């Protein structure tokens, strides 16, 4: 009986302390404030390039090669292209590498590719701004011609190559070299003979870089290897 009485007394003491605490609290005290949401710093590595005759823009960000963000929206607001990025599903496995990867954005028809285009990119815990130099002769909107294209990005020597084909047989760049005063060659790895390719047709974009062509206009890219046999395409813009 003694042990039970001590336990009962302990419970009464705890209840008394709780009541005392409630009585001493100020009924009109200041409400708890939520912590301020921090705005993420602008990504210094964000890049951009014109592609597909002006129908697409490739955005370059750093991150996992297997978890590339997708563009949800792209709207021209007061002369600024505002792009919203969506991250892959939380349960999607992501490699732990840190590489430049490309998010493709459809260009609104009211954008004039001949003029410099400020781009603002936002997403979950992400923000970046970049200015894309204008390129004449490009036209946004309309249907793609499914031909390869390339555009200089905003980082020095960096460019994006866009090809079309199977989503499971994406061409892999093995080498890039300047092969002339206004020419570079992109070499792709050979496709394994036993590789199975789906019959879909999707855009496939890859980031590459080359030295020695800064400031050179009208550079041609020669695509070799894989399904390409010396295909020549212009690189939109000028290398930084």
Task: Give residue ranges: language-model regions.
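C-terminal motif of bacterial Sec signal peptides marking the signal peptidase cleavage site
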Residues: 17-21
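Surface-exposed beta-loop interaction hotspot
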Residues: 108-110, 120-167
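Bacterial signal peptide processing site
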Residues: 23-26
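Short, aliphatic-rich beta-strand segments
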Residues: 74-88, 176-190
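Short, surface-exposed binding/anchoring microloops in extracellular/periplasmic proteins
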Residues: 45-75, 149-175
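Bacterial N-terminal signal peptides that target proteins for export
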Residues: 1-10
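A short amphipathic beta-strand at an alpha->beta junction
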Residues: 109-129, 210-237
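An anionic, turn-rich surface loop/hairpin at beta-sheet edges
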Residues: 86-102, 188-209
């Amino acid at each position: 009986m003694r042990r039970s009485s001590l336990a009962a007394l302990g419970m009464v003491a705890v209840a008394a302390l709780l009541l005392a605490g409630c009585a001493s609290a100020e009924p009109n005290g200041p409400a708890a404030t939520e912590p301020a949401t921090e705005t993420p710093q602008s990504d210094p590595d964000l890049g951009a390039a014109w592609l597909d005759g002006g129908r697409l823009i490739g955005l370059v960000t750093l991150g996992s090669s297997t978890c590339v963000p997708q563009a949800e929206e792209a709207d021209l607001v007061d002369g600024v292209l505002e792009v919203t990025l969506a991250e892959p599903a939380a349960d999607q496995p992501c490699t732990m590498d840190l590489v430049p990867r490309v998010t493709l954005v459809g260009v609104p028809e009211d954008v004039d590719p001949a003029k410099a285009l400020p781009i603002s990119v936002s997403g979950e815990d992400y923000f970046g701004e970049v200015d894309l130099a204008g390129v004449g002769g490009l036209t946004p909107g309309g249907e793609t011609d499914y031909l390869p294209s390339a555009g200089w990005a905003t980082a020095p020597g960096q460019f994006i190559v866009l090809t079309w084909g199977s989503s499971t047989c994406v061409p892999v760049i093995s080498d890039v070299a300047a092969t002339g005063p206004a020419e570079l060659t992109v070499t792709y790895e050979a496709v394994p003979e036993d590789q199975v390719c789906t019959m879909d047709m999707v855009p496939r974009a890859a980031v590459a870089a080359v030295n020695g062509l800064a400031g050179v206009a009208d550079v041609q890219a020669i695509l070799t290897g894989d399904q390409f046999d010396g295909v020549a395409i212009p690189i939109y813009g000028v290398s930084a």
